[in-house]
From Swiss-Prot:
Its main location: cytoplasm. Its EC number is 3.6.5.-. Belongs to the TRAFAC class OBG-HflX-like GTPase superfamily. OBG GTPase family. One of its GO terms (biological process) is ribosome biogenesis. An essential GTPase which binds GTP, GDP and possibly (p)ppGpp with moderate affinity, with high nucleotide exchange rates and a fairly low GTP hydrolysis rate. Plays a role in control of the cell cycle, stress response, ribosome biogenesis and in those bacteria that undergo differentiation, in morphogenesis control. Monomer. Residues 129-145 have a biased composition (Polar residues). This is GTPase Obg. Pfam families: GTP1_OBG, MMR_HSR1.
């Protein structure tokens, strides 16, 4: 199935049903009073995370989702039926953004998580709600309010513990094939990897982590060059980044300059991403003697001003790969996801009409105090009749 990690959709919640103006009329009960019922609330639109999905391709074709309108109220104090909700299922890891305001409405990070993205309109009030001691035949009612309408941007961001980055042909796909059951395409030309892939690295029966492979970065990636800019966002949720460096590039390029390009593109894209823990991993050491590889790796690290630990591996022959994976596993165990980050609240999104009923009833009460006989006229059989005799 084609990997699609962005989609724009329109969500429209249902309008609220209108209130009803009605008076009870039955045999022997000519003046039964108001009995108009309220309308029904409009249906809501929800997002739900589903671990069985892994792409947003469905929303390239179906772009509009509308909840059902609430039914109008009826006589005999009958309340209108509430509109049916609409639930949109998205892959775990989807971020929901309101395109109109730029607000992030929420991150769908757990299976079964639900997020309200469009709230249905409030029901209108029937005339029964407006009766009082001074207004026994109210002809007021309120209409239902419109439901929320939003243009949403869905961004799928892979959930992985470890992210891999590097220049094209650095050996990222070969590495993920060596440590997991994932089988991304491997070839001797740049940009063999066109879409991100995930692999589960199982260290033993109880310990494992997920590694993400994205297309290689090139200079100018943060401005849109190559494929990297589309997929850098998939590294935002990783806990550690493995920066693979081809220790002996076949094209004769300088490994130091290649590494600086990657670092520069990370900083241009996001300071938060650039600040993540990043490990240097020198790949393809099987192409030279061990001592030569160690000397070259040391020289590159010094040129980059690298003071931390670095690794020498050969993904093709799996030399040094096991030790690297165990160190990654230890780091993940010792650095669990921060509770504050896990419980991070989305930006508060205001929904329309939250105080609608309270405001409407307050206005009616004010009007009743100022002019309590507004609803009476000469043809009103329910009104009070005054006869003056001189």
């Amino acid at each position: 199935m084609k990997f699609v990690d962005e989609a724009s959709i329109l969500v429209v919640a249902g309008d609220g049903g209108n209130g009803c103006v009605s008076f009870r009329r039955e045999k022997y009960i000519p003046k039964g009073g108001p009995d108009g019922g309220d309308g029904g609330d409009g249906g809501d639109v929800w997002m739900e995370a589903d671990e069985n999905l892994n792409t947003l391709i469905d929303y390239r074709f179906e772009k509009s989702f509308r909840a059902e309108r609430g039914q109008n109220g009826a006589s005999r104090d009958c309340t209108g039926k509430r509109g049916k909700d609409v639930t949109i299922k998205v892959p775990v890891g989807t971020r929901v953004i309101d395109q109109g305001t730029g607000e992030t409405m929420g991150d769908m990070t757990k299976h079964g998580q639900r997020l309200l993205v469009a709230k249905g309109g409030w029901h209108g009030l029937g005339n029964t709600r407006f009766k009082s001691s001074v207004n026994r035949t109210p002809r007021q009612k309120t209409n239902g309010t419109p439901g929320d309408k939003r243009d949403l941007l869905l961004e799928l961001m892979l959930l992985a513990d470890v992210g891999m980055l590097g220049m094209p042909n650095a050996g990222k796909s070969t590495f993920i094939r060596a440590v997991s059951a994932a089988k991304p395409k491997v070839a001797d030309y740049p940009f063999t990897t066109l879409v991100p892939s995930l692999g589960v690295v199982r260290m033993d029966s109880e310990k494992s982590f997920v590694v993400a492979d994205i297309p290689g970065l090139i200079e100018g990636a943060a401005e849109g060059a190559g494929l990297g800019i589309r997929f850098l966002k998939h590294l935002e949720r990783c806990r550690v980044l493995l920066h693979l460096i081809d220790i002996d590039p076949i094209d004769g390029s300088d490994p130091v300059e290649n590494a600086r390009i990657i670092i520069g593109e990370l900083e241009k894209y996001s300071q938060d991403l650039a600040a993540k823990p990043r490990w240097l991993v020198f790949n393809k050491i099987d192409l030279m003697d061990k001592s030569e590889a160690e000397e070259k790796a040391k020289a590159i690290a010094e040129a980059l001003g690298w003071e931390g630990k670095y690794y020498l591996i050969s993904a093709a022959s799996q030399l040094g790969v096991k030790d690297l994976c165990w160190d990654v596993m230890t780091f993940i165990i010792e650095n669990p996801i921060a509770q504050a980050e896990e419980a991070k609240q989305p930006e508060k999104v205001e929904f329309m009409w939250d105080d609608y009923h309270r405001q409407q009833l307050a206005e009616v009460e004010e009007d009743a105090d100022d002019d309590w006989d507004d609803d009476w006229d000469e043809d009103d059989e329910e009104g009070v009749e005054f006869i003056y005799k001189r």
